[in-house]
Amino acid sequence: MPPGTKGDPSNVTQPLPCLPSAEEDAIKVFVRIRPPVEGTLTGVDGEQGSCLTALSSTTIRLHSKPEPKMFTFDHVANVDTTQESVFSSVAKNIVESCMNGYNGTIFAYGQTGSGKTFTMLGPSESDNFTHNLRGVIPRSFEYLFFLINREKEKAGDGKSFLCKCSFIEIYNEQIFDLLDSASAGLFLREHIKKGVFVVGAVEQVVTSAAEAYQVLSMGWRNRRVASTSMNRESSRSHAVFTVTIESMEKTNDIVNIRSSQLNLVDLAGSERQKDTQTEGVRLKEAGSINRSLSCLGQVITALVDVANGRQRHICYRDSKLTFLLRDSLGGNAKTFIIANVHPGSKCFGETLSTLQFAQRAKLIKNKAVVNEDTQGNVSQLQAEVKKLKEQLSQLLSGQMPGDISVARAPSVGDNMDYMNTFIEAMMLLERSDSEKKALLQKVIQLEDLCNKKEKFIQSNKMIVKFREDHIVRLEKAHREGQISLSNNEQDNFIAELKEEIRTLKEQVEHHPRVAKYALENHSLREENKRIGSLQSVKRAQEVSAQMMAELEKAFLEASVSEKDRQVAPMHSTPIQLDNSSLMSAARMRERMLQLESELATSKQEYEEFKELTKKKQVEQESELQSLMKSNQHLENILDAIKENKRHEVSQLNRMHAETIKNMTTPTKAYNLRSRLVPRLSLDGISNGLTDTPKSGDVMDDIINEPIPPEMSEQAYEAIAEELRIVQEQVTALQVKLDEEESKNIKLEQQVNKLELCSTQIQELFNSERSNWNKEQQAFIAQIKSLEKQQQDNKNQEDVLKSEVHDLRVVLQSADRELSAVKGEYSLFREKQEKELSQLSARHMAVQLQLDNFRLEHETLLEEKRSLQDAFDNLEEVMKFETDQLKQELSDSKHENETLRAELSNLLELLETEKERRQKLTSQLEEDKESKTKELLQVVDENMHLRKQCSELVTKCEHQVTELQRLEHSLTSSKEMIADLEKKNTADKEVVVDLMNQIQVHRTTIIHKTESIDLLTRELEDINSKYSIVLLAKEECKTVNEEQEKQIEELRESLERKQSADNIEKELLCDDLAHATEELGKLTEAFNKQETMLHACEKELVEKEQLISELTNKVKLMTDLEITKTEQEKIKPSHSNSNSPVVLAQTPRTPVGNPYESEFANLQNRNTNLAVLISELNEERTLKNEEIIKLKMQLCETENMHLEIQNLQGICKELKSQLENCKKGMKDGNEQKPSDMQDLKREIEKEVSERMEKGKATEHILKLQAELEETRNLLCAKDHSLNELNNEMERTRSLEAKAFTEKEQIRSVLEAKYEETEKLSQELDMLRKQVSFLAEENGKILGHQNPNQKIQYLVKLKKENDKLLEEAEKLRIENLFLKETKKCEHCD
């Protein structure tokens, strides 16, 4: 579409600023001024009269008379605004809010030809979706699907989107589907969830901006467009393009669904038949367009009145357009209106009405909400609801933990804040609902109380009236001396008494005290119901109900017996009627007394309830004490169980030691039986000196003989079997013990409860018995008082009977007078009713007339208001048109002067031509004979000149006629000037302002030409910068992708490492526990062996006496054997003492080596942070290893010193023991070799146990070191993970920053594209102007001289070459920009 048809944007480098509005959901207004068309640029001075100017980005001034009008909007775009700035100011925020679940609407409003379709769609070319001047709708598609793709990249498979498009038009108040060309008229329907929708409209699913473009172009081809005098392609219908966006997000089996609608509306423009010159079908279309737009204006006016607090009916259903856009205008949507205005003076009235419409629409406030629904697994949702209920109950009971936010991780803080706010909101809602219900109930009760008070007052008035009438009648009868009454009078009197009794009953029923008591009774009953739910109260109520039933039965029997005594034969006499009325009054009194007694009982019940609550409190306190006692008892039992377990463990250890001892004794017997021992006799003793070496060898063989493996396996199996049996017995006993203890605890609790219940029941029973005795005595006293009262009532009844008999006689006379007065009263009442009916009829008629007058007055006021607006508009238009006529008059004067100057010039030229002709003719006559050839040429030239002269003569004639016509028009204009001279004085200042503005515009044109050059240079710089930014962006993308991959790999490796570390940690803990158990066992075994060694020492002391006798005989043999045994013992002791050192210096394999290798691989992938982390981790691990090694060495040295000391002490003891044993061997005792062998074995066993203990300690130290290493590794991994998370956050912020910079650069590029388009258009227009001016100049000048013509042609050629060079530059720049744009789209 060319700029001249629907509006033309111009260049601006930056988008308009988005100002924050006071109300977030108020309708925002964007005003755009349409640029002038091409035809207006070829005026007299290159300018056209503009009726408005944009003062700033938010204010606009309309040049009206006598004073200009100022309008303020959210955004005001001048003539130079680009399509990109319009999109960034209007549609960008709306599209983002639609992504967040809000409904959004954008529609363009304005007169026909003001640029609505150009703003919404763009130019009418076929490639307008990729055109640089494309409108709001295509750009909205691009941005929407860009945001969708971005969200998908962020969320992955957890979030999905569905976009559906529909396209309809409203033509002549009928709805048609543009996506289905064969569809008939569609209908609007309303749904409780969807709102207003079109039945049967086609919805196409789209997945990209290109598909949305196809849907839009397919529907746009079906739209009704026609040509008018103001617009070559005028929209003849309202078009509504709707995009439905649905997003589904899954988190832990819960699905959050958000849905929103984006309505993009292109309204048809308002038209005037005088301006557009429409007729026939076009006129009908214009009428329906104007009607729907007027309905839109009425709806907006009504919404503004409602916002200001007035009660107005909003007529949405008067037009299909307003009904369809109901939510957008005053409901659940965020709305932006683009008001397009025409700056031309001819469109002043429509421009003014458009600005007033936009100003009213700006005052409307919508209430946009997020359209969100939650679905998912029922169990998950139920668990969430249960969790929320538990938290709510805890918060209500005051048991909610205060540090719940501290215990959570920092990432859960937002959820906890949300949960706390949600709980507070729920509590506030419940509290407000309960308060509201209580207040409503109180209001109802108070209204009932007021009604009852009114009825009570009315009944009192009636009673007073009856009594006054009765007194008057009695006084009259007393004065007249009437004693007897007729039957009619008696009947009337009885009827009046009955009426009085009825009013008394009503008074009793509607008495305010009774109502108050009823309210108190109601509240007490509710309290009683709550109390009655308790078991103790239920029991008490049952007992009281039984007692009450018995008392009521006794009272009824007593009352029946009284009635039987007092019943007399009934006769239908006036006295009996009187008796019945008196009885009814007595019954009412009894009822009153009964109500008062019920009130007293209810109060008494309330006191009893207080006592019961106190008892319940005492009961609970006693229960609490019993529970505390039971808790103390359980703690004592637990301590006893622990002590018992310790005792059992010690017993098991003893049993284990005994079993080991028993199992090891057969090995000794086996060793003793398996070897031949030389028999000792007297000969052997005598020959001992010679046989000692052989016996020593035998002893060595016996000692060095190994134990057979079968015996050790049997010993181990026996120990394991015994341990298993003991463990099974222990577990069974423990289970039984637990069961018995739990049973015992339950029984003790039951016993305590039963004791407490029995004591409380006994106390309650005693108190209730005393209460019932008191109540029984009170009832007996009440019965006695009632009997006395009954007797008094009988006496009073007798007196009243006599009085009634006397009064009846008086009443018979009074009834006659009453009947006469009633007749008079009935006549008076009939007259009064007739008058009242007449007055009411008159009142209704007057009221109807008043209503009609009010309606007429309102309609007249509305008509007056509309006429006033129309009058103001017409007045403004008339003033503006007069200004335009004055301007045209001045222009015509100027043109007239120019024409006169041209005419004088032409006359001078004509005279010069005549002189030239005369000169030429004279020269021809002189040179006639000599220059025949030249004569012929001159003749030709003369003929040519004659033709030119004839042409000039014709031109002069035409100019003379035109001059006459202009003189005639001048005379008519002079007459008009005479009429307008008075007004001209007032408008001179405005003309001066306009001239100044023209001068300013001329200067701005010069500055703009200079700025165009600067902008072209800046464009080149920006292009170069943009290419650099694109390269940097690509590098950033690659770096981000690599970092994301590295982060994912690091996460996976960390998870693997954490799982492996956890498994190893568990294994190490198990090993450590096993090692500690083995160490305990070894210490126990060592203690047992020490006890055995002490026992052996005692035996040795007993046998020292025998050994001392044989010392003298075996001195030589003992010396030799001592030396041998010392050498043999020193060797194993040295080997034993050196073995821990060797073991301690064995190489250690750390657990963290595979993790360090993996971490090294991760460090190679990471760039900067990983190097630092690896260095720190290496230093830390080295230091930890050094510390652990030093600790191990210290422990080993200490252990070695201790073991050496122990071994030295043991060696000394063993040496002494061996010396003693060898001395005792001389006696020939058979037990000595076996004892020595046992001692050696015990020593070897003790040494091996010490070695195992050392190994176990070394193993424990190794495990501790490995644990420290794993802990350090975990700390390092946590630190690196935190750093990676920080790096992730930083990359995200950089990505967001890059996104915003990219959007800014894209908007700048779009503005540059539009600038190039505008520059090319202006270049074409300038070329046309140059050609036109060249033709006009050639015509005016006529090129008298060939040299002038040649110079002029050379000048034109140079200018043409310059223009061609500029055009070539601009074409190259345009191609470069298109290529960069294609590259950007490819990216």
Curated annotation (Swiss-Prot):
Locations listed in the record: Cytoplasm; Cytoplasm, Cytoskeleton, Microtubule organizing center, Centrosome; Cytoplasm, Cytoskeleton, Spindle; Cytoplasm, Cytoskeleton, Spindle pole
Keywords carried by this UniProt record: ATP-binding, Coiled coil, Cytoplasm, Cytoskeleton, Microtubule, Motor protein, Nucleotide-binding
CDD domains: KISc_KLP2_like
Span list, region Necessary for its targeting to microtubule minus ends: 1138-1387
Domain Kinesin motor as annotated: residue spans: 26-364
GO biological process per UniProt: centrosome separation; microtubule-based movement; mitotic spindle assembly
Highest taxon above the source species: Eukaryota
GO CC terms in record: centrosome; cytoplasm; microtubule; spindle pole
Tissue note: Strongly expressed in testis and weakly in lung (at protein level).
Binding site for ATP: G110, Q111, T112, G113, S114, G115, K116, T117
Coiled coil: 369-1383
GO MF annotations in UniProt: ATP binding; microtubule binding; plus-end-directed microtubule motor activity
Record text on subunit structure and interactions: Homodimer. Dimerization is required for targeting to microtubule minus ends. Found in a complex with tpx2 and microtubules. Its association with microtubules and targeting to microtubule minus ends requires tpx2.
Family that this chain belongs to: Belongs to the TRAFAC class myosin-kinesin ATPase superfamily. Kinesin family. KLP2 subfamily.
Role played: Plus-end directed kinesin-like motor enzyme involved in mitotic spindle assembly. Required for centrosome separation and maintenance of spindle bipolarity during mitosis.
Protein name: Kinesin-like protein KIF15-B
